[in-house]
Amino acid sequence: MNSKLFSPYTIKNVTLKNRIVMSPMCMYSSGNEDGRVTNFHLIHYGTRAAGQVGLVMVEATAVLAEGRISNKDLGIWDDNLIEGLHKTTTFIHDNGAKAAIQLAHAGRKAELGTNAFAPSAIPFSDTMKIPVEMNIQQIKETILAFQRAALRSKQAGFDVIELHGAHGYLINEFLSPLTNKRTDEYGGSPENRYRFLREIIDSVNKVWDGPIFVRISANDYHPDGLTVQDYVQYTKWMKEQGIDLIDCSSGAVVPAHIDVYPGYQVQYAKHIKEYTKIATGAVGLITTGSQAEQILNDNEADLIFIGRELLRNPYFPRIAANELGFELQEPHQYKRAPGKIHTNK
């Protein structure tokens, strides 16, 4: 049986063997608090590659040490961190998948016991510290840090990079009027609030020639915040700059109640794709092969990002293939266990 989920997908100069992406998920497992890859990361990502995920995306990886969410985050702020990341990409590639990395700065959500930095001195909540408002020099240094991180990503062997512009972290904080109250060239109008991301993309493009994704929070879930329609304009600008795909998540820029249900964020991938003609990724409570297949067949997204379901079962692609009646070529080491995989779900 043919399956769109298990069809190859080419984006720029990279071809994925199928359309399943391991969504970036923080593991908080850099044990020595130095940003380095550990054996856990090799097993964690390598297992999903062996499980036949098409694109394995490494978790939010900090471009600056002070930009970590926690002191156990992975980092890419120094050349001495390349070696561990290169081992990770090699392990992923050896198991038949492509490798991506999400480049991130936590902004006001950094919880390191030191200063957190943001576009404006507004805390995320009453229980979190007031961040330091970034000056122009700090903004320029952070933009340069993203560029250097992109170059290190290339040296580490990654095929794709994703800029983390969602979930209330630094890029998202500049984009949203809820968190950006600046009166200089980086605040105010949508064009000015986009300037930080624009300059990051321009800077990254100078050193990176592979596909670039951007993860967005397509809804702030606040009456004065951004909606998916605001992100249509942002996405048009990103597309003009050469961004290849928008990974459509939502929320977390401010505390908010979110009604969560199966595929609740697919609507954003569909909307962005329809109104900007850019490739999109759907993410959020996509848990079965038939659900993923339907999203693709309905042309609501181009790639399917799977998060928690891959934590539950790193061999989700095999289960999805069985469900869809698609014969998936398993690793030769596992050929003694052909046929259907049974679950208790």
Swiss-Prot record:
Annotated CDD domains: OYE_YqiM_FMN (cd02932)
Domain of life: Bacteria
SUPFAM superfamilies cross-referenced by the UniProt entry: FMN-linked oxidoreductases
Signal sequence segment: none
Coiled-coil parts of chain: none
Pfam assignment, any one: Oxidored_FMN
Residues at which FMN binds: 23-26, 60, 102, 215, 307-308
GO biological process: response to toxic substance
Catalytic activity: A + NADPH + H(+) = AH2 + NADP(+)
UniProt keyword list: Detoxification, Flavoprotein, FMN, NADP, Oxidoreductase
Record-listed E.C. numbers: 1.6.99.1
Binding positions for substrate per the UniProt entry: 28, 164-167
GO molecular function terms listed in the Swiss-Prot or TrEMBL record: FMN binding; NADP binding; NADPH dehydrogenase activity
Swiss-Prot/TrEMBL cofactor(s): FMN
NCBIfam families per record: PRK13523.1
Assigned protein family: Belongs to the NADH:flavin oxidoreductase/NADH oxidase family. NamA subfamily.
Function in brief: Catalyzes the reduction of the double bond of an array of alpha,beta-unsaturated aldehydes and ketones. It also reduces the nitro group of nitroester and nitroaromatic compounds. It could have a role in detoxification processes.
Subunit composition and interactions: Homotetramer.
Protein name per Swiss-Prot or TrEMBL: NADPH dehydrogenase
Organism: Bacillus cereus (strain G9842)
Taxonomic placement: Bacteria, Bacillati, Bacillota, Bacilli, Bacillales
